[in-house]
């Protein structure tokens, strides 16, 4: 459960506007378990599998442990996606957080290494940080930054001051702001400021040069309070650009939602998913390309359960990569429908794979379900959202990315010179529609698909 903040897609801001601080639900009945022994056995299986699983490192470094991986592959978004490498990456990575600011004493549910956790969880991925001296003192009540946050409020903005990033994270969690959109919006403003599309008169005198940690922290507070220039940025970079009438060439959005810290120029299936996803750019709506590229042999048995048997070359975006994106999107949608954690459960590197998840549902409900039936649940959810969007006039025309991803090449490191090929990408989008059974011209679900999914 999320016990601190709920910011992505603006839900935290909506709660804040209503002065709603939390939603608490209490029941007085225990859920009926169809096969307790089978469920207990799955728990034992997970305990035994944990040491050799892909989630063991999350307990020590959290998701910030992947900073070095992203840097090595040229996929660490830097200076508002102008580059995929950041010279100051070591200042914001997992080991640095662990050694420098991770809370070190037991308080409440936290353990001796400053890890908060969901009830009964073996992985214990959440970070809790505390800073008691210097210009940025940070209260552990507001948790700590994970990978997305150290990137968006770090490398995106060219900031290599970990304490400033932790402080900005605290402010976001205090106000219910999404750290991804907040950091990306500030990075957009910094690039626009550098290009003189935004002036110091508009920023209220703030010097929004890349790397200015003090300005980043101050602007985060201003956004949360809708003060001064923060009021212009408070609804995201796309609306800020529209309001100012300039700066669109610096946007990194899909459906007006800022891109997370996984670069679509590097992970090409995400270039597709960011665009076609019903609620815009999201890194937790499908599996990532490496699982179906060089990492396939590690996850072969699990992916084959989903019918994924033909690993692809890096940065490819042909029909089979589209198939990977679509099927894992359905699977992740299923996980959301079941309210399962995407670190504990998933199609590749996670602790529990597709086979175990089927057994889990069978044990709890007693239903004799198959993986195909469960994938249809995820597909049904996505089509419901797609139908809602169609009613609101959101269709193929909005299934795209900001021009920057197509027009500007990355600078430096392994991804130097990379950009998204528009022709290849548009062909992949059409292929995705065909595989989904949607109308290619509009991108909307067809009557046949809606009837098949009992949504007609």
Give the location of each predicted region.
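Extended C-terminal regions of large enzymes
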Residues: 1-9, 15-456
């Amino acid at each position: 459960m999320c016990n601190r903040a709920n910011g992505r897609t603006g839900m935290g801001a909506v709660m804040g506007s209503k002065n709603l601080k939390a939603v608490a639900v209490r029941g007085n009945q225990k859920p009926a378990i169809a096969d307790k022994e089978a469920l207990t056995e799955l728990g034992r299986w997970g305990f035994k599998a944990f040491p050799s699983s892909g989630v063991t490192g999350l307990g020590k470094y959290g998701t910030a442990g992947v900073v070095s991986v992203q840097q090595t592959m040229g996929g660490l978004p830097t200076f508002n996606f102008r580059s995929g490498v950041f010279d100051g990456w070591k200042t914001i990575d997992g080991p640095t957080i662990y050694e420098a600011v991770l809370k070190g004493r037991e308080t409440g549910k936290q353990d001796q290494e400053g890890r908060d956790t969901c009830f009964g969880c073996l992985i214990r991925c959440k970070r809790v940080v505390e800073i008691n001296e210097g210009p940025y003192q940070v209260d552990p009540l507001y948790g700590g930054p994970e990978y997305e946050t150290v990137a968006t409020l770090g490398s995106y903005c060219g900031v290599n001051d970990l304490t400033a990033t932790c402080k900005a994270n605290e402010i976001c969690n205090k106000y219910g702001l999404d750290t991804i959109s907040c950091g990306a919006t500030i990075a957009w403003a910094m690039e626009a400021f550098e290009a003189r599309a935004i002036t110091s008169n508009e920023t209220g005198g703030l010097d929004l040069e890349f790397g200015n940690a003090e300005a980043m922290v101050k602007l985060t507070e201003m956004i949360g309070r809708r003060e001064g220039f923060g009021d212009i940025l408070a609804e995201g970079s796309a609306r800020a650009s529209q309001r100012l009438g300039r700066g669109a060439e610096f946007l990194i959005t899909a459906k007006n939602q800022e891109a997370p810290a996984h670069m679509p120029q590097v992970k090409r299936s995400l270039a597709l998913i960011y665009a076609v996803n019903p609620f815009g750019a999201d890194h937790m709506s499908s599996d990532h390309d490496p699982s179906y590229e060089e990492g396939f042999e590690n996850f072969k048995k699990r992916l084959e359960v989903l019918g994924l048997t033909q690993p692809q070359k890096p940065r490819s975006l042909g029909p089979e990569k589209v198939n990977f994106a679509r099927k894992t999107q359905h699977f992740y949608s299923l996980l959301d429908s079941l309210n399962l954690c995407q670190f504990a459960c998933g199609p590749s590197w996670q602790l529990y794979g597709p086979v175990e998840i089927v057994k889990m549902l069978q044990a709890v409900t007693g239903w004799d379900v198959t993986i195909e039936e469960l994938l249809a649940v995820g597909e049904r959810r996505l089509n419901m959202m797609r139908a809602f969007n169609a009613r609101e006039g959101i269709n193929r025309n909005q299934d795209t990315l900001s021009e920057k991803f197509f027009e500007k090449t990355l600078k430096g490191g392994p991804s130097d010179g990379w950009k998204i090929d528009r022709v290849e990408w548009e062909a992949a989008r059409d292929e995705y529609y065909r595989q989904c059974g949607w109308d290619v011209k509009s991108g909307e679900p067809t009557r046949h698909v809606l009837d098949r999914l009992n949504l007609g």
